[in-house]
């Protein structure tokens, strides 16, 4: 009885049609394609770091060429994120992966860590490229096209240390004062962010725990195959049965490993990305409130400084325009982000559910096939005795 011949026909899952559903309709008008790949390790006397190759292909007229290739390190991505937040304080900037080592990893720059970060950086740049406003940001263009020396020179053109410190001080002062009359729609938005943050963090923890338990289950199960093989050597009457069980366990181990890969590639990164998004949203709301707080302080000052009415009136007019622009930008980006979030999470959970169904179908079919073969054994022995 050859247990390697077990290849049970897997029933076609009715959920396979889900793969045919497209959540985002509309014509493909993409004209900017970005790939992050080819990580390289660099060791100096001061530090060790990784750079990634970024290949950009585009048909946009504002670019000097149709294809660019540069190398960037994580600090460059941080710089880009900061410049985008500075230029568009109330737009929802995609999150970067954490700078420090992910919990549970032994080596900071092992292959799994580097590949996980590469995927996250790739998604970060492509989310910016797909954003209707951020994609045309000048700093983003420079990031994609400038060589290392050019980028270093470009960075030095930004605001000086004192200017950045002044912005930070004003931001802290505004946060201490707090916003007095936040519009109702932004109160609702803030409540949504708080609730979403709590739930997505809980989902992230549960997902990580499920993956850990799945890993422990897999590590334990893969030991049972060899145990049954050794057992069969001392049980002559049960050789075929024990070897058959070992074969089934091996097949279930392969199915479990595939399921774990699906969790680590399809579900865990998406859920964790939206954990980081929830933190980004808190920052966006603070920056919106800061703009409104500046307006409120000028209005309040106007009541005490009659002599400077004309100057304050002009400043108030500018701040009213700034608040209106900030509110409109955030409201438009908020709806876009919510739709993307729903699509991403729905797709991640749907894919995971379908993978789970396939996993259980495969394991069930494996054991059913084995049990059927064992049920047929007595009749075969009886027929041999009759002969």
From Swiss-Prot:
Q: Which GO terms describe its molecular function?
A: phosphatidylinositol binding
Please indicate if the UniProt record lists Transferase as a keyword: no
Alphabetically sorted, this entry's keywords are: Endosome, Lipid-binding, Membrane, Protein transport, Transport
Any one GO CC term of this protein is: early endosome membrane
InterPro entries, A to Z: AH/BAR_dom_sf, BAR_SNX7, PX_dom, PX_dom_sf, PX_SNX7
Known CDD domains for this protein?
Answer: BAR_SNX7, PX_SNX7
Domain PX stretches? 30-151
Specify which residues bind a 1,2-diacyl-sn-glycero-3-phospho-(1D-myo-inositol-3-phosphate) according to the UniProt entry for this protein.
73, 75, 103, 117
Where's the BAR domain?
Answer: 178-387
The organism's superkingdom is given as: Eukaryota
Protein family according to the UniProt entry: Belongs to the sorting nexin family.
> What this chain does, per the record?
Involved in the regulation of endocytosis and in several stages of intracellular trafficking. Together with SNX4, involved in autophagosome assembly by regulating trafficking and recycling of phospholipid scramblase ATG9A.
Q: Which PANTHER family match?
A: SORTING NEXIN-4, SORTING NEXIN-7
Q: What is this protein called?
A: Sorting nexin-7
Query: What organism is recorded for this protein?
Result: Mus musculus (Mouse)
């Amino acid at each position: 009885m050859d247990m390697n011949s077990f290849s049970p026909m897997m029933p076609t899952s009715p959920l396979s049609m889900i793969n045919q559903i497209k959540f985002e309709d509309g014509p493909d008008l993409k004209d900017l394609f970005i790939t992050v790949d080819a990580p390289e390790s660099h060791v100096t006397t001061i530090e060790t770091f990784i750079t990634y190759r970024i290949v950009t292909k585009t048909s946009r007229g504002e670019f000097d060429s149709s294809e660019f290739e540069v190398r960037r390190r994580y600090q460059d991505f941080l710089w880009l994120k900061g410049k985008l937040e500075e230029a568009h304080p109330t737009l929802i900037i995609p999150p970067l992966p954490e700078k420090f080592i992910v919990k549970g990893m032994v080596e900071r720059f092992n292959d799994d860590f580097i590949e996980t970060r590469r995927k996250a950086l790739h998604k970060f740049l492509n989310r910016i490229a797909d954003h209707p406003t951020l994609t045309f940001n000048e700093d983003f263009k420079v990031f994609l096209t400038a060589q290392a020396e050019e980028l270093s020179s470009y960075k030095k053109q930004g605001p000086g240390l004192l200017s950045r410190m002044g912005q930070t001080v004003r931001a802290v002062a505004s946060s201490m004062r707090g916003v007095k009359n936040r519009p109702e729609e932004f109160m609702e938005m803030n409540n949504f962010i708080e609730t979403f943050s709590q739930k997505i963090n809980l989902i992230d923890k549960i997902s990580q725990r499920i993956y850990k338990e799945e890993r422990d289950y897999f590590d334990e199960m893969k030991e049972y195959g060899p145990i049954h093989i050794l057992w069969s050597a001392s049980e002559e009457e049960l050789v075929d049965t024990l070897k058959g069980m070992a074969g089934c366990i091996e097949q279930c181990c392969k199915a479990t490993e595939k399921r774990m890969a699906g969790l680590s590639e399809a579900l865990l990164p998406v859920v964790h990305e939206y954990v980081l998004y929830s933190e980004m949203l808190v920052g966006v709301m603070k920056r919106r409130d800061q703009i409104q707080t500046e307006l409120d302080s000028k209005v309040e000052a106007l009541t005490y400084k009659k002599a400077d009415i004309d100057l304050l009136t002009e400043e108030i007019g500018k701040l009213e325009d700034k608040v209106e622009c900030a509110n409109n930008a955030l409201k438009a980006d908020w709806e876009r982000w919510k739709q993307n979030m729903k699509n991403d999470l729905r797709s991640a959970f749907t894919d995971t559910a379908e993978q789970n169904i396939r996993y259980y179908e495969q394991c069930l079919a494996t054991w059913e096939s084995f049990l059927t073969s064992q049920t047929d054994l007595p009749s075969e022995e009886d027929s041999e005795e009759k002969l």
